[in-house]
């Protein structure tokens, strides 16, 4: 069996993508932070003592996407052209739904950057809110959609 990230000597290597064609790459990922309804209200009302939770999480998610190759050893450093995060309050489930869309034009996809963006944003929400809710849960981190490259356009059912 041949592994793409292991060389002939059995050591780790970054996959050579130099022969691939550049194409527009887009990935959309999601994470959910579950919490007490009171915590969600404090976040919405700007009543968390550490400050603007979603504003800081937005910046953290963007920074996370930009730093993905520094965090995940075999990820290629990419020239991202767009990172956008959106937050939605799910009142029924006392959750904040985070979605990130990441774009580039290049030889490899941006799935890991989108997943890292929502993960770091979720961790930031947790960090800034943990003083009022120690039992928050970060769940459902997943890729929702990707396009570009040989795989074409894929959407999670």
Swiss-Prot record:
Tell me which residues this entry annotates as catalytic: 127
Classify the source by domain of life.
Answer: Bacteria
Entry keywords, A to Z: Lyase, Molybdenum cofactor biosynthesis
According to the UniProt entry, what is the EC number of this protein? 4.6.1.17
Supply the InterPro entries for this chain: MoaC, MoaC_bact/euk, MoaC_sf, MoCo_biosynth_MoaA/MoaC, Mopterin_CF_biosynth-C_dom
* UniProt subunit comment: Homohexamer; trimer of dimers.
Which GO terms of the molecular function aspect are on file? cyclic pyranopterin monophosphate synthase activity
GO biological process entries:
Mo-molybdopterin cofactor biosynthetic process
Q: Which Gene3D superfamilies match?
A: Molybdopterin cofactor biosynthesis C (MoaC) domain
KW Chloroplast (keyword) present? no
EC class = lyase
The chemistry this enzyme catalyses reads: (8S)-3',8-cyclo-7,8-dihydroguanosine 5'-triphosphate = cyclic pyranopterin phosphate + diphosphate
Transmembrane helix: is it a keyword of this entry? no
Q: What is the protein's known function?
A: Catalyzes the conversion of (8S)-3',8-cyclo-7,8-dihydroguanosine 5'-triphosphate to cyclic pyranopterin monophosphate (cPMP).
Query: What NCBIfam families does the database record attribute to this sequence?
Result: moaC (TIGR00581), PRK09364.1 (NF006870)
**Annotated family:** Belongs to the MoaC family.
Binding of substrate, residues: 74-76, 112-113
- Lineage of origin: Bacteria, Bacillati, Bacillota, Clostridia, Eubacteriales
Pathway where it operates: Cofactor biosynthesis; molybdopterin biosynthesis
- The protein depicted here goes by the name Cyclic pyranopterin monophosphate synthase
User: Organism source for this protein?
Assistant: Syntrophomonas wolfei subsp. wolfei (strain DSM 2245B / Goettingen)
């Amino acid at each position: 069996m041949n592994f793409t990230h292991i060389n002939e000597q059995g050591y780790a290597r970054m996959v050579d993508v130099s022969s691939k064609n550049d194409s527009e790459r887009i990935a959309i990922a999601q994470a959910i932070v579950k919490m007490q309804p009171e915590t969600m209200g404090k976040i919405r009302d700007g009543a968390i003592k550490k400050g603007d939770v979603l504003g800081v999480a937005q910046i953290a998610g963007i920074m996370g996407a930009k730093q993905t190759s520094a965090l995940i050893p075999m990820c290629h450093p990419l020239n991202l052209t767009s990172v956008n995060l959106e937050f939605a309050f799910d009142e029924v489930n006392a959750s904040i739904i985070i979605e990130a869309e990441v774009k580039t034009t290049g030889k490899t996809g941006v799935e890991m950057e989108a997943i890292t963006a929502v993960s770091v944003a979720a961790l930031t929400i947790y960090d800034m809110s943990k003083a009022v809710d120690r039992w928050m849960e970060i769940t459902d981190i997943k890729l929702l959609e990707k396009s570009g490259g040989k795989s074409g356009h894929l959407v999670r059912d």
